Amino acid sequence: MSVKFIEASDEDAIEISQILEDWAKSNHEIPLAHNNDERADYGRWLLEHTSVTMIHNSSGVVGFLALEKHIIQGLYIKKDFQGFGFGQAAIIFAQKQFEELRLWVFQSNIGAQKFYQRLGFQIVEKSDGEDNDYRLPDIFYCWKST
């Protein structure tokens, strides 16, 4: 697997918005709390307030990682590229930058829970989702370098 990490620029906003839109459409258990314009706004917010890294393979963009210091605000891999190690490579990329990483995962997203636990993340707390946009129960994870 060939993977490159390239710092995102304003020109990546459309690609980020499309990845977010595709994610929202493919996750049927998660209600569409945001319309396409709101997801585009969120993509722009990520570019302005976090460090966004585009994940590339030999044919182009396969996803992105958004970090706000040591907090993972988003790791999105296009559906056709999931299961090929791009997400794991992105986490390893982030782990090389920080001694601790934190993130929230929806409790309904069993695949993501298994993914992060396999990479050494530990559950810190569970919530009823009152504080997230989707109002879905979620889990707060933390990884610490050993």
Located regions from the model:
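Conserved N-terminal entry element of GNAT/NAT acetyltransferase domains
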Residues: 1-11, 146
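Conserved GNAT-fold acetyl-CoA-binding loop/helix
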Residues: 10, 17-43
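Conserved beta-hairpin
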Residues: 50-63
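Conserved donor-binding loop and adjoining core beta-sheet/short helix segment
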Residues: 62-73
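A short, internal acetyl-CoA/4′-phosphopantetheine-binding micro-motif in the GNAT/acyltransferase core
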Residues: 72-82, 105-106
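Conserved acetyl-CoA pyrophosphate-binding loop and the N-cap/start of the following alpha-helix
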Residues: 80-81, 85-93
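C-terminal "cap" of GNAT-fold acetyltransferases
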Residues: 102, 106-113, 119, 125-146
